[in-house]
Amino acid sequence: MSVTEKQLQEVLTGFEFPGTPVLQGVYGNGHINHTYLLHVMEQNGNKKRMILQQMNRSVFKKPVEVMENIMGVTSHLRRKIVENGGDPERETLNVLLAKDGKPYYVDSCGEYWRIYHFIEGASCYEQVESEEDFYQSALSFGNFQCLLSDYPAETIPGFHDTKQRFANFKRAVEADVMGRAKAVEREIEFVLAREQDAAVLGNLLAAGELPLRVTHNDTKLNNIMIDDATRQGICVIDLDTVMPGLSVNDFGDSIRFGASTA
């Protein structure tokens, strides 16, 4: 997924900027998408920062659907934030549209690109530095689910299905394409011995004992923008994995990340 300077310049011509975009270079330490920082010089002399991303099609097989999901979710969030007297420019992601009105641009190589407005005065943290950080993460993701509680989950394709993930795992172990299963036999046995646990939540959902929600599915601290001045969580980011699921999975994932000492 290497990117050339020519490709980047082509991409910049595809978006409706409020000024002249100037590429600043690679940004952040994400491992899935290629991310770049842009400075947009407006006619009044102001400078706005934006985030340019090349979507990884090896991971996201249907980038158009991903962006449609994000637009639907963020539009809903904006409405709810305004109703609550909040700031929709800082409390949810905002997408810059391409010149054709779409929330993405497809370059001549068939690669998909998107641009987000930069959230100023806020930062992401790679690890929990205090109990308050963990609390702010929980508060932010809880608020995220609350704001989306009346969003129709069934309109989003896909589902976070642990039972299906387990079936995929068993097939991968059996195929052992890279010949590495032997080295982790104990770990594999540990997982296989708990196969029945993989279906518990799905069975509760099917029985109507747990509700289907719109879930984030990657509830890590570094997917929260924390205000630099107040040290409070203000915005949930990385919405690529948003899909119908169970809120308890989001809770468990956040505990896994925050409580780990590894």
Spans of model-derived segments:
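ATP-dependent phospho-/nucleotidyl transfer catalytic cores
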Residues: 25-29, 53-54, 60-65, 119-139, ...
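ATP-binding glycine-rich phosphate-binding loop
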Residues: 17-43
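Active-site beta-strand-loop-beta-strand hairpin of nuclease catalytic cores
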Residues: 39-49, 230-232
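Active-site activation/catalytic loop segments of kinase-like enzymes and analogous catalytic loops
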Residues: 248-262
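Juxta-kinase regulatory segment immediately upstream of eukaryotic protein kinase catalytic domains
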Residues: 1-25, 73, 77
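ATP-binding pocket architecture of kinase catalytic cores
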Residues: 45-71, 75-153
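Conserved active-site aspartate in kinases
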Residues: 238
